[in-house]
């Protein structure tokens, strides 16, 4: 595989471009580098991709992701009281000790965890979900009240959920738009999905990004320059650690934190470049 085989050869502007560390050798062959140089400067979604291209002599810069511009169409001035947890990150390393600990914890917090388990989008038995969710509830209740966790809506954006429930690209696009409109009106979104978190920034919806602090390079390379835009809760050694000052999020009207505004410059630059490109293509 090389870029020439997957990208157009006529008038083109490359923005929000990403190369994963697993694909860098295949994507940075001499013919691909030549193609990129013909179309530079290259706007890169993350600093990892930018640095890869700069090292190859390609004029590149950090552009951010196009999803930061979704607020131009989908931002909603009307907000509801809904809180969405979209694949919030948590991980339990199961052994006999952690299993016993989970069962004991569940005995003391069964009612709250059971209410979450009944609507948590996992295809597992009810009891198994409850045991798994002890890790989630134990850590997330440090930052969110029981009322928030119990009443929140839980959404799965994993690939298998879509492949099982949507049969066409048109149906998938419709579902994506439905979710974007939900997030646009949300009081708060908590997610490990970058393409949920970035649109929330663009739509000015309060968002907290959750991550695995020990993720692989192939995963971490996607976030360079983007992670700095978020309020982050990092899962490290079985515990959540915030990178921002946060009290416990409860059912009051205001939070003790706000989204960073750094994304606004990136979104404006992306919009301007796209509009300029479209106008130039008709001249």
Predicted stretch roles:
Residues 1-283:
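Active-site anion-handling motifs in enzyme catalytic cores
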């Amino acid at each position: 595989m090389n870029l020439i085989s997957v990208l157009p050869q006529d008038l083109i502007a490359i923005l929000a471009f990403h190369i994963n560390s697993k694909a860098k050798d295949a994507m940075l062959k001499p013919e691909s580098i030549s193609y990129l140089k013909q179309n530079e400067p290259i706007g890169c979604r993350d600093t990892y991709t930018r640095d890869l291209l700069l090292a190859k002599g390609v004029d590149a810069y950090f552009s951010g992701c196009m999803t930061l511009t979704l607020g131009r169409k989908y931002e909603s001035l009307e907000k509801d009281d809904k809180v969405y947890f979209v694949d919030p990150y948590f991980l339990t390393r199961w052994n006999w000790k952690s299993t016993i600990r989970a069962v004991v914890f569940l005995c003391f917090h069964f009612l709250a965890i059971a209410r979450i388990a009944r609507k948590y989008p996992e295809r597992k038995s009810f009891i198994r979900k409850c045991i798994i969710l002890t890790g989630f509830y134990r850590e997330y209740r440090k930052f969110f009240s029981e009322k928030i966790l119990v009443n929140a809506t839980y959404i799965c954006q994993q690939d298998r959920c879509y492949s099982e429930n949507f049969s066409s690209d048109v149906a998938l696009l419709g579902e994506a738009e439905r979710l974007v409109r939900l997030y646009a009106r949300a009081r708060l979104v908590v997610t490990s999905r970058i393409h949920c978190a970035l649109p929330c920034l663009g739509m000015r919806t309060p968002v907290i990004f959750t991550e695995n602090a020990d993720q692989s390079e192939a995963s971490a390379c996607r976030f360079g320059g983007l992670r700095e835009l978020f309020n982050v809760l990092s899962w490290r050694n079985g515990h959540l650690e915030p990178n921002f000052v946060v009290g416990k999020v409860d059912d009051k009207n205001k939070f003790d934190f706000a989204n960073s505004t750094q994304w606004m410059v990136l979104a404006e630059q992306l919009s301007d470049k796209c509009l300029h490109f479209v106008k130039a293509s008709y001249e």
